């Protein structure tokens, strides 16, 4: 009985997400990083002249404003950038 109870406790701990962590793509989308606490957005930065070629990707706390030369796209789900 104790073994069954211990097994149920372990399974519960493994299955519960004890603290949600966002995952954002790095520059090469095959790789991603787990964002630290407080950084709850993924972002993609690219030059307006070349929108198909991202310059930077990662985690961020506040989405920066785009400019005439640089555009930022932010999102808040895993690997959305």
From Swiss-Prot:
Compartments in which it is found: Secreted; Target cell membrane
InterPro entries the record matches: Cytotoxin_Cobra (IPR003572), Snake_3FTx (IPR003571), Snake_toxin-like_sf (IPR045860), Snake_toxin_con_site (IPR018354), Toxin_cobra-type (IPR054131)
Keyword Secreted: yes
An annotated GO BP: killing of cells of another organism
GO MF, one example: toxin activity
Signal peptide: 1-21
Xref: Pfam families: Toxin_cobra-type
Disulphide connectivity of cysteines: 24-42, 35-59, 63-74, 75-80
Keywords: Cytolysis, Disulfide bond, Membrane, Pharmaceutical, Secreted, Signal, Target cell membrane, Target membrane, Toxin
One term under GO cellular component: extracellular region
Tissue occurrence: Expressed by the venom gland.
UniProt family annotation: Belongs to the three-finger toxin family. Short-chain subfamily. Type IA cytotoxin sub-subfamily.
Subunit structure: Monomer in solution; homodimer and oligomer in the presence of negatively charged lipids forming a pore with a size ranging between 20 and 30 Angstroms.
Purpose: Shows cytolytic activity on many different cells by forming pores in lipid membranes. Exhibits concentration-dependent growth inhibitory effects in the lung cell lines A549 (IC(50)= 0.88) and NL20 (IC(50)= 1.91), in the prostate cell lines PC-3 (IC(50)= 3.13 ug/ml) and RWPE-1 (IC(50)=0.35 ug/ml), and in the breast cell lines MCF-7 (IC(50)= 9.10 ug/ml) and 184B5 (IC(50)=6.21 ug/ml), with high selectivity for the lung cancer cell line A549 (selectivity index=2.17).
Name of this protein: Cytotoxin 1
Organism: Naja sumatrana
Classification of source organism: Eukaryota, Metazoa, Chordata, Craniata, Vertebrata
